[in-house]
UniProtKB/Swiss-Prot annotation:
Subunit organization: In plastids the minimal PEP RNA polymerase catalytic core is composed of four subunits: alpha, beta, beta', and beta''. When a (nuclear-encoded) sigma factor is associated with the core the holoenzyme is formed, which can initiate transcription.
Gene: rpoC2
Leader peptide range in chain numbering: none
Pfam families associated with the record: RNA_pol_Rpb1_4, RNA_pol_Rpb1_5
GO molecular function terms noted in the UniProt entry: DNA binding; DNA-directed RNA polymerase activity; zinc ion binding
Cytoplasm is among the record's keywords: no
Species classification: Eukaryota, Viridiplantae, Streptophyta, Embryophyta, Tracheophyta
Organism of provenance: Spinacia oleracea (Spinach)
Protein name according to UniProt: DNA-directed RNA polymerase subunit beta''
Enzyme class, UniProt record, top EC level: transferase
UniProt keyword terms in alphabetical order: Chloroplast, DNA-directed RNA polymerase, Metal-binding, Nucleotidyltransferase, Plastid, Transcription, Transferase, Zinc
GO biological process terms, semicolon-separated: DNA-templated transcription
Residues that hold Zn(2+) according to the record: 224, 295, 302, 305
CDD domains, A to Z: RNAP_beta'_C
Protein purpose: DNA-dependent RNA polymerase catalyzes the transcription of DNA into RNA using the four ribonucleoside triphosphates as substrates.
Length: 1361
């Protein structure tokens, strides 16, 4: 007893809480001290003590023990506030849907996480012995996330697809859930239960398929003698050391490893922990290891390529069924992992960024040169810092220094005042291995119907110019302008024209015309019978020509059948002249009317051209003009491209009335092709020039070598060998007209000839007389008659001039590319117009095509608008308003902030329902014409202010007058007596234009005063319609804002016509906002806005549909591709593994795929040197794809924290990639094209027959690979038994019973383990292949070096791990 006491005195007294590790240490020390039996006795006593104490404390769990966290209330409130602001920004078009979703998820996730962190301290402070606290934090029962759901908040749930439900559950289970929350909660929690049931079977099936693929792979040899390997570099910093060690341990080296001249490891040595650590410490360059990929045996594997057995740590035994082990090791974790979803009840887990908060109130300062402005993934403006940034916060007396790590977002501006705990920066969340990201497509759908417009800064990806898909190069808005679409197939609208007014509820079209006093009854019948071609003078009654200011409609005469081959800015009017029909030689030709891309014509610009078929040639040749001195009207060089507009500058006004064409035959051949004729030799017709082309004409051959091609020209004609006396110009040829006499034969020439001197050698020369085809240029078809002249003369003196010009210069050689005909002369229509009488010059015209449907036939019009240039008139000095205007005259402000509008808040709607405007648009399918019927019922108007000075008699009356059918711009006519008014009209050039309008009372008999206004639509058309007429501009949904009348005294109003306005950008003194939309009318005291909804789109997004296309509610507008983190559980992981193994691709092809392939090709040639670059390319492709497949599968399992050795996956991947597809050419006598054969078999056959074999590497899924094996018995026992057996019987297949499954089915001995011995003698003679081959075959050795020693290539593959 005393001894015990003495010992006890020596023992250390511990007074600590004991946890698992301390317990382990204690037990091990007890065992060391007392032995096993005594220790177990002590531990028993401990257990009893524990139970006693627990009984005495009487820990029980009651509902009162669930204490909620006090700070929860304001945290939730704060999050709701943030969500509200976010919703507003989305509505204004500042952030798009993906950013909104992403941010709302992060707001709620961080709130929930914050609560979770608060939980523990809260318990510790308020009630440290709380049973819930003791239980969950000691690890006895329950974990933090479950307690968090009880007392914190349940937070965000994920739906069965693993997507987020962005409505958070704010309550916890202690408080009880609301109905919505309960339903969402059940939705999420049910997922766990269902998944477990469903996925267990999936995982089982996956295992079965995997085992099926590799069941025959057994270790059958010690060494296959391969010299290949896969290189791994320990210096490669991208790969974590842990993964590197995992990759290397248990493998076998494929080559000796030297450190300088010292060999530190030899070939075929297996790598242990010690060796790996040596590699890492010595930082060896490249380690070449053997893997199942490099094994040379076709249907089994050798010990050295497999490496160590995972069970006993030595090299794997002969006869071990490594295939089945591999299949099970991949399939098994799937079954285990499915059960994990169960416990959290579908609560979403994801990552958020960490925040840096301000330590105190104060002014923040940092170095602005170190940061760059950017847009965060939530759409907020921020600064990005690339290096460590030091931020100082200066409060009353203290300076705080905050260090912000690199690659963080700074969310505040310099010198801004920040409050304590305000978020000033966001640290990018480090990508943790647990939640891997994936690319998701998100479609944005339209909420309203209308017309689609883009902001001005949307470009097309060049390859999609005429397609329906547009990529965005930079952030911009997409607008859906309101309006109600109708299809034109409905009867009542078949006669309406663009910009007509019509009654939306009327069933017959006549009512409109008759109810309109300006059209009489017989005109209606006239129009109904044939609305276009009756009498052209009558048409002026119609709204288009006399109502729209500055719009000339040029439309074709009636005899033309108008077939519009539409492109975006050109169409062709085909027609056949009567002379052509007789000949019927040429195909249908037409006039192409072409509009410049920006729609602007300058003076003298070509507006249509016609390719006359008489001036077409099939063959190549040279054009010459009548004499050498003459010039063409237009040289090709003088067609100056001016902003995409072809413009004429007539240089030589000499009229060319004839030109000559000298035919020749030209062949352009590849540089490598063999030519069968000599230079300057003379050949006959139909001679073979190359292996597969013959000459069409006879004559002299001229061969010229250009950069990469050979140009072979054949000149036809007679050959004369002249005497000494003849003097022929040494220069290029001479044209000899028919009248002249030839010096030699002195007989008259019937035709023009062209004499050319050819000198094959220095002394000899001969003369080639070549035939010439003369062309007279006549007036041809008078194009101007196609367009009625009187219409053009009527207004603004638009003229069309016909110009013929020769497309090729004098002596220029024309080349026809592969049988296309060459047009020699093109007839052009040049648009010109005279100056106005007043002398105001019109610089440019805008062209656009208008389509109008009448009587079921669509007609196309070309509309040419003359746009007056914007000139600012400065008013006279004595005008009191002009001094104030002077300063704001040319200011160019940011268009968003240049709007100052003073509307009154009261909204008055007093319009009746039945007015509307037709606006025609081209639909998606070109045949069906769409109309937008726009009713004026949606117009908003904000009434006049107090400041507006009206004439006295008007003040008594209400300024709003009920609508009569044809009044006013929006159906309102304000009766205001005659007075001066001026207003600003700002075109796109942002130069102020002040118009003084003086209205003459005598002209208006209908009402005392009419509004004047301008309206501009997207083509830049400016209207100045007459309110009495039957045309009303498009009242889409219009918002009419009244501005302040005396704006000269207060501020000048700047609004661009056609400008898009976002909601909430123009904040005025009075504090009212505009709605979002497009500005249509600027008036002296008001502005009209067509309401529109903006959608933000960021770069890389895909737009659907064309500009100006009609959008219905629910149509897809934009597709975003964005990355998001998956919620971490294997239910999403398993299908991923399956996708990779079954080779099903769901990824969208990345936009820069081609570039990547190109750079990869360049890299291969750079590494391998060009000679056999692509021979090895095929092999490398297979290697590369195998490695990336392994990486993909590993990524999924690693994200779940499951470790699978690479070699298991490699065995499977080797089977998937082991087959190739025989292509059509080559080996036709052995294999059928399209047959699947083994890669090794293909190579062996190729070697045996010494013939090249063409094949394509394929990826088979595991199911297909199981059905394409050597053994039909194994295939039949897997799937499709009847089909497989029937096929095998018909083909007479033989099963060699090499695998396990066949032997099991037939009850034989399986060839693995002990049964392997009976199998050995087959392969004994190949047992050891001498390794000298490596030294003998130098070339193969070098290839091995080149292939596998280049780090560049495989670094990229392995780094993805």
């Amino acid at each position: 007893m005393e001894v015990l006491m003495a010992e006890r005195a020596n023992l250390v007294f511990h007074n600590k809480a004991i946890d698992g590790t301390a317990m382990k240490r204690l037990i091990s020390r007890l065992i060391d001290h007392f032995g096993m039996a005594y220790t177990s006795h002590i531990l028993d006593q401990l257990k009893t003590l524990g139970f006693q104490q627990a009984t005495a404390t009487s820990i029980s769990l009651g509902i009162d023990d669930l204490l909620t966290i006090p700070s929860k209330g304001w945290l939730v409130q704060d999050a709701e506030q943030q969500s509200l602001i976010l919703e507003k920004h989305h509505h204004y078009g500042n952030v798009h849907a993906v950013e909104k979703l992403r941010q709302s998820i992060e707001i709620w996730y961080s709130t929930s996480e914050y609560l979770r962190q608060e939980m523990n301290p809260n318990f510790r402070m308020t009630d440290p012995y709380n049973p819930v606290h003791i239980m969950s934090f000691s690890g006895a029962r329950g974990n933090v996330s479950q307690v968090h759901q009880l007392v914190g908040m349940r937070g965000l749930m994920s739906d069965p697809q693993g997507q987020m439900i962005d409505l958070p559950i704010q309550s916890n289970l202690r408080e009880g859930l609301s109905l919505t929350e309960y339903i969402i909660s059940c939705y999420g929690a049910r997922k766990g239960v269902v998944d477990t049931a469903v996925r267990t079977s999936d995982a089982g099936y996956l295992t079965r398929r995997l085992v099926e693929v590799v069941q025959h792979i057994v270790v059958r040899r010690r060494d296959c003698g391969t010299i290949r390997g896969i290189s791994v570099s320990p210096q490669n910093s991208t790969m974590p050391e842990r993964i590197l060690i995992q990759t290397l341990i248990g493998r076998v080296l494929a080559d000796d490893i030297y450190m300088g001249s010292r060999c530190i490891a030899t070939r075929n040595q297996d790598i242990g922990v010690g060796l790996v650590n040596r590699f890492i410490t010595l930082r060896t360059q490249l380690i070449s290891i053997r893997t199942p990929f490099t094994c040379r045996s076709a249907s089994w594997i050798c010990r050295l390529c497999y490496g160590r057995s995972p069970t006993h740590g030595g090299l794997v035994e002969l006869g071990e069924a490594v295939g089945i082990i591999a299949g099970q090791s991949i399939g098994e974790p799937g079954t285990q992992l499915t059960l994990r979803t169960f416990h959290t009840g579908g609560v979403f887990t994801g990552g958020t960024a960490e925040h840096v908060r301000a330590p105190s109130n104060g002014k923040i300062q940092f170095n602005e040169d170190l940061v760059h402005p950017t847009r965060t993934r939530h759409g907020h403006p921020a600064f990005l810092c690339y290096i460590d940034l030091y931020v100082t916060i200066e409060s009353d007396d203290i300076l705080h220094n905050v260090n912000i790590p690199p690659k963080s977002f700074l969310l505040v501006q310099n010198d801004q005042y920040v409050e304590s705990e305000q978020v000033i920066a966001e640290i990018r969340a480090g990508t943790s291995t647990l939640n891997f990201k994936e690319r998701v497509r998100k479609h944005i759908y339209s909420d309203s119907e209308g017309e689609m417009h883009w902001s001005t800064d949307v470009y097309h990806a060049p390859e999609f110019t005429y397609g329906n898909v547009h990529l965005l190069p930079k952030t911009s808005h997409l607008w859906v302008l309101s309006g109600k679409p109708y299809r034109s197939s409905v009867v009542p609208f078949s006669l309406s024209k663009d910009q007509d007014q019509m009654n939306t509820h009327s069933l017959s079209f006549e009512q409109i015309y008759i109810s309109n006093p300006s059209v009489t009854n017989d005109q209606v019948k006239d129009k109904l019978s044939d609305s276009f071609s009756k009498k052209e003078d009558r048409i002026t009654d119609y709204s288009e020509l006399n109502r729209i200011g500055h719009c000339n409609l040029i439309y074709p005469a009636k005899n033309l059948d108008l077939l519009a081959k539409k492109r975006r800015n050109r169409f062709i009017i085909p027609f056949q002249g009567s002379q052509e029909r007789k000949k019927e030689l040429m195909s249908l030709s037409g006039i192409s009317i072409e509009i410049p891309i920006n729609g602007i014509f300058r003076k003298n610009s070509i507006f249509a051209y016609f390719d006359d078929p008489r001036y077409r040639r099939k063959s190549s040749g040279i054009t010459k003009y009548g004499t050498i001195e003459m010039h063409s009207i237009v040289k090709k060089e003088d067609l100056i491209e001016y902003r995409g507009v072809k413009e004429f500058r007539p240089k030589y006004q000499m009229k060319v009335d004839r030109f000559f064409f000298i035919p020749e035959e030209v062949h352009i051949l590849a540089g490598s092709s063999s030519i069968m004729v000599r230079n300057n030799s003379i050949i006959g017709v139909d001679t073979w020039i190359t292996l597969n082309t013959r000459s069409r004409i006879g004559g002299v051959v001229r061969v010229e070598r250009k950069k990469k091609k050979i140009e072979l020209t054949i000149f036809s004609g007679d050959i004369h060998f002249p005497g000494e006396t003849d003097k022929i110009s040494r220069h290029s040829g001479i044209l000899i007209p028919p009248s002249r006499k030839n010096s030699k034969d002195s007989k008259n020439l019937k035709k023009w000839i062209y004499v050319q001197r050819i000198t094959p050698t220095k002394k000899k020369y001969f003369v080639l007389v070549r035939p010439v085809v003369p062309y007279e240029i006549t007036d041809g078809i008078n194009l101007a008659t196609l367009f009625p002249q009187d219409l053009l003369q009527e207004r603004d003196n638009v003229q069309l001039r016909v110009v013929n010009y020769i497309l090729y210069g004098n002596g220029k050689v024309t080349r026809g590319i592969s049988d296309t005909s060459i047009q020699l002369v093109r007839t052009c229509l040049v648009l010109n117009w005279n100056q106005d009488k007043k002398g105001s010059s019109i610089e440019e015209a805008r062209g656009s095509f208008v389509e109008v449907r009448t009587n079921g036939m669509i007609q196309d019009f070309l509309k040419v608008n003359l746009v007056k240039p914007a000139i600012s008139y400065i008013s006279k000095r004595n005008d009191p308003s002009s001094e104030k205007k002077e300063g704001s005259d040319h200011t160019n402000m940011n268009p968003f902030y240049s709007i100052y509008i003073y509307p009154k808040t009261k909204l008055q709607k007093s319009f009746n329902q039945n007015q509307g405007t037709v606006r025609t648009l081209l639909g998606i399918n070109k045949e069906c014409q769409f109309f937008l019927i726009l009713s004026s019922s949606n117009c908003f108007r904000i009434g006049p202010f107090k400041g507006v000075k009206y004439p006295k008699e008007l003040i008594k009356k209400d300024p709003l007058i009920p609508i009569r059918n044809s009044f006013g711009p929006l159906g309102t006519a304000l009766q205001i007596a005659n007075f001066f008014s001026f207003y600003y009209l700002i075109t796109h050039n942002q130069i102020l234009v002040t118009n003084y309008l003086q209205l003459d009372n005598l002209k208006q008999t209908f009402q005392p005063f009419k509004f004047q206004y301008y309206l501009m639509d997207e083509n830049g058309r400016i209207y100045n319609p007459d309110p009495c007429s039957n045309i009303i501009f498009n009242p889409f949904k219009l918002n009419w804002y009244f501005l302040h009348y005396h704006f000269c005294e207060e501020t000048s109003t700047k609004i661009d016509l056609g400008q898009f306005v976002c909601e909430n950008v123009c904040i005025t003194k009075k504090g009212t906002h505009l709605k979002s939309g497009q500005v249509l009318i600027v008036q002296f005291d008001s502005v009209v806005i067509r309401s529109a909804k903006p959608y933000l789109a960021t770069p890389g997004a895909t737009l659907h549909g064309h500009y100006g296309e009609i959008i219905y509610e629910g149509d897809t507008l934009v597709t975003f591709i964005y990355e998001k983190s998956r919620s971490g559980d294997i239910t999403q992981g398993l299908p991923k593994v399956e996708q990779v193994l079954e080779v099903r691709s769901i990824d969208s092809i990345s936009i820069n795929l081609e570039k990547r392939i190109d750079s990869w090709n360049e890299r291969i040639t750079r590494i391998l040197g060009s000679p056999w670059g692509f021979l090895i390319g095929a092999e490398l492709t297979i290697a590369q794809s195998r490695i990336s497949l392994v990486n993909k599968i590993q990524k999924v399992y690693r994200s779940q924290g499951v470790q699978i050795h690479n070699r298991h996956i490699e065995i499977i991947v080797r089977q998937i990639t082991s087959k190739v597809l025989v292509s059509e050419d080559g080996m036709s006598n052995v294999f059928l094209p399209g047959e699947l054969i083994g890669l090794f078999r293909a190579e062996r056959t190729g070697r045996a027959l010494e013939e090249a074999i063409c094949y394509r590497a394929t990826l088979l899924g595991i199911t297909r690979a199981s059905l394409n094996t050597q053994s039909f018995i194994s295939e039949a026992s897997f799937q499709e038994t009847a089909r497989v057996l029937a096929k095998a019987a018909l083909r007479g297949r033989i099963d060699w019973l090499k695998g396990l499954k066949e032997n099991v089915v037939l009850g034989g001995m399986i060839p693995v383990g002990t049964g392997f011995k009976g199998f050995v003698h087959h392969s004994s003679q190949h047992k050891d292949i001498p390794l000298k081959t490596k030294k003998q075959n130098l070339f193969e050795g070098e290839m091995g070096d080149i292939l596998f020693y280049h780090r560049e290539l495989f670094e990229s593959c392995l780094s993805k791990n």
